[in-house]
A protein has these predicted regions:
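N-terminal segment of the mature folded domain
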Residues: 24-146
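Ligand-binding cleft/hinge of the Venus flytrap
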Residues: 56-61, 134-185
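A ligand-binding cleft/hinge motif common to bilobed small-molecule-binding domains
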Residues: 93-102, 193-222
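Periplasmic-binding protein-like
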Residues: 116-118, 147-149, 214-248, 251-267
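Short helix-loop capping/hinge motifs at secondary-structure junctions, enriched
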Residues: 125-132, 151-153, 239-245
Length: 267
């Protein structure tokens, strides 16, 4: 007779490894979603939240309805979102698609792309290396940070650096760019920390990061030929508080657009 424990391990281990390598959280069957608590609750990755908070301030001033925005790495808020989220936001289409694998209350049919922004180059304050565009990043000795989910984190930055580097169909561009990468951050927050702590020369990211961290970074645009665009989107729960839809109405209004544009979000 074969030993039972090794046989069980052989059967279970591959499955367990697959779970540990997932780029999204696992649904908790014991959690029952109920968003009707009189508070508009939004959850999503860091980045858009700073602009969303400005819109929320205007909404609360006009209506008196509380809006609670929770942002950051998904593991820090997933259980609460499974319980009471009115709105999820995705920082890219692939980002929200991954979220919907966990938050089964929400439907892909209800996802609304609301704004879009371009990939840019963040450089150290004052741009000490004089970076003016993508070609400067191919120079020997450049230190570049990129954002990459690496199969274990859900982030809008996944693949962006490769899309930018390979935009013109040049394998040599990809090779030379990759040689200069000093950190792959599993999320924009992690990338920002690496950019600061390593005093990297450049970081391929989104406009909102240097805009909201002017003491640390400056923004250098990519050329039109190199620019990659990704959207921010929202999806409402079927049982969302009625005020949640009204908040989205303000978010997507002309007033909302003016606020969002202050951090690089356009449409």
């Amino acid at each position: 007779m074969k030993p039972v424990i090794p046989a069980l391990l052989a059967a279970v281990l591959p499955w367990a490894l697959c779970l540990s390598a997932t780029a999204h959280e696992i649904p908790a069957p014991a959690i029952v979603h109920n968003a009707r608590d009189g508070v508009v609750r939004l959850y999503g990755a860091g980045g858009p939240d700073t602009a969303f908070r400005k819109v929320a301030t205007a909404y609360q001033k006009n209506t008196g309805v509380q809006v609670v925005i929770t942002a950051g790495p998904e593991p820090t808020w997933t259980k609460n979102a499974q319980a009471n989220a009115d709105i999820l936001w995705g920082t890219a289409e692939q980002d929200i698609t991954a979220f919907l694998e966990t938050y089964k209350t929400f439907s892909s049919r209800d996802v609304m792309p609301i704004y879009i922004r371009p990939a840019i180059i963040a450089v150290q304050k004052g741009n000490p290396k004089g970076i003016r565009g993508f070609d400067d990043l191919l120079k020997n000795g450049m230190k570049i940070v990129v954002t990459e989910g690496s199969g274990v984190a859900n982030t809008s930055g996944t693949g962006v650096w490769e899309d930018v580097a390979g935009r013109l169909g040049s394998l040599d561009d990809v090779k030379r760019f990759r040689t200069n990468i000093v950190a792959f951050g599993k999320g924009s927050g992690a990338s920002y920390k690496a950019f600061v702590s390593m005093h990297a020369d450049a970081w391929i990211t989104w406009p909102d990061w240097p805009i909201t961290h002017p003491e640390q970074a400056d923004l250098v645009p990519l050329s039109k030929a190199r620019t990659i665009w990704r959207d921010v989107n929202v999806v409402l729960a079927p049982d969302a508080d009625p005020e949640a839809r009204k908040f989205v109405g303000l978010l997507t209004s002309e007033e909302g657009a003016r606020i969002m544009k202050t951090e690089g979000w356009v449409r």
